């Protein structure tokens, strides 16, 4: 599937720094990649294409865009893959409710997402892969799990046995009750009769009336959610990728289960060196989500005349691991900051440029500390100086590292 237009990414002079990120599994900062050799490999879970792109989505993809940019700044070749869950229960339900073909709904929302990512200057993945086009890959992975004895049948549906992976639970570190609760809230079926374990997850669902289905050795049907990402990531990136990324609501069950499926299918461990998660963005005291309908959409803000760089800057004003709530003042504050930065760039001279760039790099490579990074540029912009090359250098660094075009 086609991704979107790649922005220009300038090269910033001066010494780069190695990136450290918070790994959910270990509960601490890890350096990724762990050595000087590349490529740096990253998989980020993509959207289910309906109601794209809300600010929670945008925050996630801007966060991992920073990872991409910092790796490039450090000299790594980056191999980045992102999926699109272009067949799933919520998509089918929305299509039915609105009287639209599910394929048409998916196509429309995917294009809207592409347009938003282009406007926000997010670097596209090398592989932008839909689930529908990946059905053969999913079938292969399920067959591997069968050979490993990790799949069983319940009335024609196939389930992954989580106990087949001794490492299951190691990403989230949640207790059994929490896992069961979250599994039920996030698409799972812990109470289904015939399952060996309440947490066992669906990998192949037999054909249902009125729903899309594909031929397979297991009968006609469609894949479960978690195996889709396992299959796509293994195909394009292999095992022990550097970063598995997504929103914090994916820690369990999605990332836990997709990692276990990959580990059982290959017999290798771990699936990823770092599991990195963007915190939730809410509105009016609640999580922003499609199911709640309390969405602030990037496309609507753009149509209303908001500068996409102000939208991006508003997202960067919050550390990626801190939950926060969108308000109208977020965008107003970001536009004001953007105006100050742009004004500082046009003055011709400024404070020491290399020092500002080094402060920017130091903040961002320390677990994407965007609040400190923005403060460093604020300080530079609000201070007078006589370095004739500072403005051009800072503008270059803000473009390359923060993705903000001044």
From Swiss-Prot:
A motif ('HIGH' region) lies at residues 47-57. L-cysteinyl-5'-AMP binds at residues 45-48, 60, 83-85, 225, 247-249, 281. It holds the Pfam family tRNA-synt_1e. This is L-cysteine:1D-myo-inositol 2-amino-2-deoxy-alpha-D-glucopyranoside ligase. GO terms for cellular component: cytosol. Monomer. GO terms for biological process: cysteinyl-tRNA aminoacylation; mycothiol biosynthetic process. Keywords: ATP-binding, Ligase, Metal-binding, Nucleotide-binding, Zinc. The gene is mshC. InterPro entries: Cys-tRNA/MSH_ligase, Mycothiol_ligase_MshC, Rossmann-like_a/b/a_fold, tRNA-synt_1_cat_dom. Belongs to the class-I aminoacyl-tRNA synthetase family. MshC subfamily. It comes from Kribbella flavida (strain DSM 17836 / JCM 10339 / NBRC 14399). Catalyzes the ATP-dependent condensation of GlcN-Ins and L-cysteine to form L-Cys-GlcN-Ins. Its cofactor is Zn(2+). Zn(2+) binds at residues 45, 229, 254. Its EC number is 6.3.1.13.
């Amino acid at each position: 599937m086609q991704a979107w237009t790649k922005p220009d990414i300038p090269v910033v002079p001066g010494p780069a720094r190695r990136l450290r990120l918070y790994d959910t599994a270990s509960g601490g900062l890890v350096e990724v990649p762990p050595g000087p050799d590349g490529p740096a490999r990253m998989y980020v879970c993509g959207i289910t294409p309906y109601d794209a792109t809300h600010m929670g989505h945008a925050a996630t993809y801007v966060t991992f865009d920073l990872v991409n940019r910092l790796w490039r700044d450090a000299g790594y070749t980056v191999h980045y893959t992102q999926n699109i869950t272009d067949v799933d229960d919520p998509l089918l339900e929305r299509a039915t409710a609105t009287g639209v073909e599910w394929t048409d709904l998916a196509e429309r929302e995917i294009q809207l997402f592409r347009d938003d990512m282009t406007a926000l200057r997010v670097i596209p993945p090398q592989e932008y892969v839909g689930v529908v086009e990946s059905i053969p890959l999913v079938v292969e992975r399920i067959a591997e799990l069968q050979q490993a004895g990790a799949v069983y049948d319940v009335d024609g549906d196939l389930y992954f046995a989580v106990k087949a992976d001794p490492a299951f639970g190691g990403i989230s570190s949640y207790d059994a009750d929490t896992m069961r609760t979250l599994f039920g809230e996030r698409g799972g079926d812990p109470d289904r009769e015939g399952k060996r374990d309440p947490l066992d997850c669906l990998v192949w669902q037999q054909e249902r009336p009125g729903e899309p289905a594909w031929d397979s050795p297991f009968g006609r049907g469609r894949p479960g959610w978690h195996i889709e990402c396992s299959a796509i990531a293994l195909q394009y990136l292999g095992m022990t990728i550097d970063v598995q990324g997504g929103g914090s609501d994916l820690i369990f069950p999605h990332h836990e289960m997709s990692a276990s499926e990959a580990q059982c299918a290959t017999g290798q461990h771990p699936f990823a060196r770092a599991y990195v998660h963007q915190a939730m963005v809410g509105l009016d005291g609640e999580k922003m989500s499609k199911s709640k309908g309390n969405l602030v959409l990037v496309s609507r803000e753009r149509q209303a005349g908001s500068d996409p760089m102000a939208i991006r800057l508003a997202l960067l004003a919050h550390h990626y691991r801190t939950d926060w709530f969108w308000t109208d003042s977020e965008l107003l504050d970001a536009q004001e900051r953007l105006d100050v930065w742009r004004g500082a760039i046009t003055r011709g001279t400024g404070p020491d440029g290399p020092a500002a760039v080094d402060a920017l790099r130091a903040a961002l490579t320390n677990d994407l500390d965007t609040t400190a990074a923005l403060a460093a540029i604020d300080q530079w912009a609000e201070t007078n100086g006589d370095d004739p090359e500072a403005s051009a250098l800072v503008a270059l660094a803000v473009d390359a590292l923060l993705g903000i075009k001044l």
